[in-house]
A protein has these predicted regions:
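The feature captures the beta-strand-to-loop junction immediately N-terminal to the Walker
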Residues: 28-30
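Helix-to-loop junction immediately C-terminal to a conserved catalytic motif
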Residues: 43
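Conserved ABC transporter NBD signature motif
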Residues: 51-59, 71, 105-110
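ABC ATPase C-loop
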Residues: 144-145
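Catalytic Walker B motif of ABC-type/P-loop ATPase nucleotide-binding domains
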Residues: 152-156
């Protein structure tokens, strides 16, 4: 059960969740509910004040973020983290310098990584500032996949996308899951979450208020009201 602070303010209160092998799980809540803080706590971008973060039965609570990436935790942030003045290819290279890929990560890169978003191959030489919002998200997810993760953390991957593009991204998440990679998605839109996840957690004011089958949450008026704000 994790407690996390941003400065003096406690953001997460006794948060506990689990993602199984090959499972897609969504963390749903309105803006400011604690979704991004949860993702950042798992990735090691924010220190956990108390509680534990475990990965494959290993306590990684005090392990730096880059070591978590090396261990197999992939991460695509909400803002995508794309360097605007660098090409897409150079953005990939920067990642490999910061977090050297595991020995087998580059083997079959085209088959495994670009099969999710083959569109990325078409703009590898384009600079980040010339990418659309959807293209930036594609690059962020592909970049995370290039490190051969066992689990992928996606922070608001569908935000700001047109409905047809959301469907494309949901198909991509399903393809990632079909590779045996676990996925944890922070998502504000409950309908999108229900389309892609096996299980769902709802968070509000830093506390988990629901967990279970995504279909069940639609029958819970209190949770629905809270999520919608």
């Amino acid at each position: 059960r994790v407690n996390t602070y941003r400065g003096p303010a406690q953001i997460l209160r006794e948060v506990s969740l689990r993602v199984g092998d090959g499972e897609s799980v969504c963390l749903v809540g309105r803006n400011g509910a604690g979704k991004t803080t949860t993702i950042d706590s798992i990735m090691g971008l924010l220190p956990v004040r108390s509680g534990r973060v475990t990965f494959r039965d290993r306590d990684i609570t005090r392990v730096p973020a880059h070591e978590r990436a090396l261990a197999g935790i992939g991460y695509a942030p909400e803002d995508c983290g794309i360097f605007p003045d660098l090409s897409v290819e150079e953005n990939f290279q920067i990642t490999s310098w910061i977090v050297p890929p595991r020995a087998n990560a580059r083997r079959g890169l085209d088959d495994r990584v670009f099969s999710v978003f083959p569109e990325v191959k078409g703009f590898m030489t384009r600079r980040g500032l010339h990418l659309s919002g959807g293209q930036k998200k594609m690059v962020a997810i592909t970049r995370a996949m290039s490190l051969a993760p066992s689990i992928l953390l996606l922070d608001e991957p569908f935000e700001g996308l047109a409905p047809v593009v959301v469907t494309r991204f949901i198909e991509a998440v399903r393809a990632i899951k079909a590779m045996g990679i676990s996925v944890l998605i922070a998502e504000s839109n409950l309908v999108n979450a229900a389309r892609v996840c096996d299980r769902l957690y709802a968070i509000d004011r830093g506390e988990i208020i629901f967990q279970g089958n995504p279909r069940d949450v639609f029958g819970n008026e209190d949770v629905m009201r809270t999520i919608r704000g």
